[in-house]
Amino acid sequence: MWKVLPVTQKPDQCLGEWIDREAIAEAMIPLIGQLYRNNNVVTSIHGRGLINRSVIAIMKAHRFARHRMADDAELSVHETFPILKAMSELKLGAASVDLGKMVAKFKAEGNGRSIEDFVKAELAEVVGKQNGDAREGTDVVLYGFGRIGRLLARILIEKTGGGDGLRLRAIVVRKGAENDLVKRASLLRRDSVHGPFDGTITIDEENNTLTANGNLIQVIYSNDPASIDYTQYGIKNALLVDNTGKWRDAEGLGQHLKCPGIDRVVLTAPGKGALKNIVHGINHTDIGADDKIISAASCTTNAIVPVLKAVNDQYGIVNGHVETVHSYTNDQNLIDNFHKGSRRGRSAPLNMVITETGAATAAAKVLPVLKGKLTGNAIRVPTPNVSMAILNLNLEKATTREEINEYLRQMAMHSDLQKQIDFVSSQEVVSTDFVGSRHAGVVDAEATICNDNRVVLYAWYDNEFGYSCQVVRVMEDMAGVNPPAFPR
């Protein structure tokens, strides 16, 4: 027999409430945009960005926030809109404001104050500071325009705001054909994995420039990294991001610093020698004013180290093994052909390929407490994007599956690692669900295995886009363009 469930809401009431929330979310969009463009204020909801988002995306961010609430209550636009409106009237200076956390703090510490008074007091540090920001925009040059280079371009263009942060000024490539500029623009505009570019792109072949969402980008053709005078394009004190992977040590990357207009260099691959390998959220505070060249480590190192740090801080790691199930990359072959690496010459779309990974060793460079405790290996699989790290760990302190999952959920919600660690608890998610994830890694709670002191954790990661977001965070720190974050 069919079970009859009681009806608690009428259809018209349900739709009416949706339309009401939809209208409020729609009213939030111009306020979010004005604060971003005019005040350099970045808004989010528990780490989910609101800039350039649709009405539905804003409503989904509110719905997602229930995972961040102690009582699993859904965050309402009726709660966030008044805070956003109050912010828009305060002539704020540059800031990063989490509306979800502002609501939670108002509920806990409002003490009978009006929302306007609470917001003014909470943001007092930047109230009335519009146009008073002493920061200058930092010019950025992308040396290379492959998978990571194009995703970095998308993120930088998206984050342009009022122009006081990172500004993409040029890309450097080797000329591949007569219609090279058109083809480069097409690859930025369309992507088989990440979808279409969110905006407009125009091409000026006479001057070798692309204009993407108002960003004038000079395309420079060169085969020699040390031979370019960037100042002739109006570029000065620039941060250059080498995403070719061709040079990985200070000597090779130092060629860029010989060029007029370049001040600092970031490598999007594991660095060799004495180069600092930086994973944002873990050791980004190690970046010093005198550091001219740093590495943003690898996608896998970025994915595993935040989770490893969280686990080690709470339970202590005795030892362990890291196995990565990694999507194929353009270093592999479509069909069997010669490759200098073992097994990697075999067809990537047709095979699972066992190969090596330096992530375990690199993790110890970023987090020295793990030195000598981890081994690692990798399996390349026939998917174009999104990988998984399996962390098989022996702990000093025994735990349970429920306890460690809840701990990692809290780390994803309320810790300093919330931009690096995400958390999902669903028996239905698969790899493509994580395309476009902006986190370094996503813990899959349903897959966690625990037996006293032994735990196996599974972390998904978008090895392209998630890693690129981490690179941009490192760039922002190196350039000193990170605004203060609220609530405190």
Per-region residue spans from a language model:
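C-terminal substrate-binding/catalytic lobe of Rossmann-fold NAD(P)-dependent dehydrogenases
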Residues: W2-A61, Q314-G316, G320-V443, A447-N453
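Short pre-catalytic strand/loop immediately N-terminal to key active-site residues, enriched for Gly-Thr
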Residues: D291-S295, R454-A459
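A generic structural signal for alpha-helix starts
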Residues: N302, A398-T399, F465-G466
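Glycine-rich phosphate/pyrophosphate-binding beta-alpha loops
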Residues: R380-P384, W460-Y467
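Generic C-terminus detector
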Residues: V455-Y461, Q470-R488
